């Protein structure tokens, strides 16, 4: 386990795996995944916006969205295709008020790993958040 006394050392460490340099402003430490979800959802929740969540998926996203009056819309994952995103269900629920889409890769609870090609089909722009073990979340 690595212990950083300041965010500049953490930014330097994480930058070694990235094609760009992180600054201390890019880092927000939380006390685990639940708090991280709370922080992100609270920032995204604006009046009239919605968030797209996978079905099945981790229930904490919906619980946090509800606390902030953020409308939840669900898109399906297709078990017969390795739990890929159902592009048709996604297109039918996304609109100009969609503020975010949750993608968990590798997926929990299904265990699937989306390919770059599948994500490109979905027309997704992904921002990768790196946790303490450098896994993509």
Which residues are covered by each model-predicted region?
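A structural motif shared across PLP-dependent enzymes of the aminotransferase-like
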Residues: 1-12, 106
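Active-site phosphate-binding strand-loop segment of PLP-dependent enzymes
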Residues: 78-137
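A short helix-loop-beta submotif of the ANL/AMP-binding
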Residues: 67-73
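Short beta->alpha connector loops at strand-helix junctions that form conserved
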Residues: 55, 74-80
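Structural signature of beta-strand start/N-cap positions in the alpha/beta core
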Residues: 49-50, 71, 99-100
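Phosphate-binding glycine-rich loop
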Residues: 7-50
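Conserved PLP-anchoring active-site segment centered on the Schiff-base-forming lysine
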Residues: 43-65
């Amino acid at each position: 386990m690595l212990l950083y006394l300041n965010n500049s050392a953490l930014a330097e460490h994480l930058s070694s795996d990235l094609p760009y340099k992180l600054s201390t402003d890019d880092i927000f430490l939380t006390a685990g995944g639940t708090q991280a979800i709370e922080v992100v959802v609270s920032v995204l929740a604006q009046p009239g916006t919605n968030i797209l969540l996978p079905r099945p998926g981790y229930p904490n996203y919906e619980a946090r969205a509800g606390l902030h009056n953020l409308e939840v819309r669900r898109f399906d994952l297709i078990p017969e295709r390795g739990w890929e995103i159902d592009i048709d269900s996604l297109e039918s629920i996304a609109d100009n008020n969609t503020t975010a889409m949750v993608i968990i890769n590798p997926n929990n609870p299904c265990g699937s790993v989306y390919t770059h090609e599948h994500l490109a089909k979905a027309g997704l722009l992904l921002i990768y958040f790196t946790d303490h073990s450098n896994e993509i979340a």
